Amino acid sequence: MTPTLLSAFWTYTLITAMTPRPNNILALSSATSHGFRQSTRVLAGMSLGFLIVMLLCAGISFSLAVIDPAAVHLLSWAGAAYIVWLAWKIATSPTKEDGLQAKPISFWASFALQFVNVKIILYGVTALSTFVLPQTQALSWVVGVSVLLAMIGTFGNVCWALAGHLFQRLFRQYGRQLNIVLALLLVYCAVRIFY
């Protein structure tokens, strides 16, 4: 990979990992509501699911030309529906202000999110088909970059969870407002899948 292409790869992956997306918003919300330690299950589920999805993206990238466009479109709708459901759960979740506390999202729920999270699927397919496959079709490189993509995504999730933890007091004071803003950001993510 040339230095220019490598620079573009890092720019794309880091910006994509750090900008708001369903995983980051969920990590922020979980750490704000439950603290970083309680959010480790959510982060672990995301990380494992993310890795598996990136490895699946490696396989998809090899055969992208033969994928049925209707199947990709159906996956987009399923992902958008799940993201909107997640937005609803966050918007309506109890806050400290309400005197109630929702349970943290489970490992398996955050794991399952990855398989309908169109944003990370597009992230993986785009990175692999743009930066890796034109340079090499060696399976070891494709798998290695898939693992790297999952690590970069996990880094973004952890950064957002740490922000939620660090600003927990402020966020808890304005919990209802924060939940609504986070829910609206998730709805925005769902809409951006199509536009």
From Swiss-Prot:
Pfam families: LysE. It comes from the Bacteria. The keyword Nucleotide-binding does not apply. One of its GO terms (biological process) is cysteine export across plasma membrane. Keywords: Amino-acid transport, Cell inner membrane, Cell membrane, Membrane, Transmembrane, Transmembrane helix, Transport. Its main location: membrane. The chain crosses the membrane at residues 47-67, 70-90, 105-125, 142-162, 177-194. One of its GO terms (cellular component) is plasma membrane. It catalyses: O-acetyl-L-serine(in) = O-acetyl-L-serine(out); L-cysteine(in) = L-cysteine(out). Disulfide bonds: none annotated. NCBIfam families: PRK10323.1. Belongs to the Rht family. This is Cysteine/O-acetylserine efflux protein. The gene is eamB.
